[in-house]
Amino acid sequence: MDQSHENGGRRSERFRRLRIWHYFANYFPVSLVKEADLDPSKNYVFGYHPHGIVSLGAVANFVSEATGFSDLFPGITPFLLTLNSNFRIPFYRDILLAIGMASVSRRSCNNLLSSGPGTAIVIVVGGATESLKAHPGTADLVLKKRLGFIRMAIHHQASLVPTFSFGENDIYEQIDSSNKGIILTVQKTVQKIVGFTLPVFYGRGIFNYNVGLVPFRHPIVTVVGKPIPVPKLEPGQTEPTEEQLLSTQALYIEELMNIYNKYKDIYAKDRKQDLQIVA
């Protein structure tokens, strides 16, 4: 099979600028907020939070120009990353490649961050585990155990950029499986086999508001935080130390909390609880 998803993708700016993306973003609506300029002579690793059910805020902001990414961050080319398994589906993979998506594998990340300045890879850090915690009014993040994206950033001297989407968890209702043995067992088994899980969720229908797979209309506001420089490896050092990883993670979490606390009373007035890092 063609390995474009591992080698930088096959993006089409024409496809990314189709009018349909504006209709998609305006449905919720989705908007993008910038905390700081990004230097196009550098590379970046965006951490996207929370995962939500299917990360539709990330789709609207980073695979199209519907929210004006290139106007806010001139000279920066974003690549939203996803699992390799998504590129095994004929035709669907071609759409993913056309909108600038690529694999989240180590090989793909290395290739993208080595391709030249102005590259930003976007990683939905919490992954499948976090999707099971996506409930309206909450923001339970799986982050403390996630050090791989920080290690990758240090290897390539790419600044880390915390990104938080208010409303991502509010566009679907999810049946809580934490106390339902059979559902939870099936979900964890599926995750082990295929690398992702299947939350039991529902939205609205096309002709009704009660149940269906269409997401509920709820504003999604994605705030892109300030870039965090990463430590340099010493001559002869091939891997960052645990201290370097944890100290960088602490700075990352601090900036993530800063943008959450700055905007939570504006964009999350109906929240049930504040952001929590649960794992």
Language-model features: locations:
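Hydrophobic alpha-helical membrane-embedded segments
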Residues: M1-G8
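Soluble catalytic domains of membrane acyltransferases
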Residues: G9-S12, R16-I228, P235-T238
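Generic macromolecular interface patches on structured domains
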Residues: L56, T163, K262, I266-K269
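Structured cytosolic regulatory/catalytic domains appended to multi-pass membrane proteins
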Residues: T119-A120, G127-E130, Q249, I253, ...
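Pol beta-like nucleotidyltransferase catalytic core
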Residues: I220-V223, E243-Y260
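Charged, glycine-interspersed solvent-exposed loop segments at helix/strand-loop junctions
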Residues: V230, P240-E243, D270-K272
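Hydrophobic alpha-helical segments
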Residues: P231, E255, I259-I266
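C-terminal helix/juxtamembrane-tail motif
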Residues: D265-A279
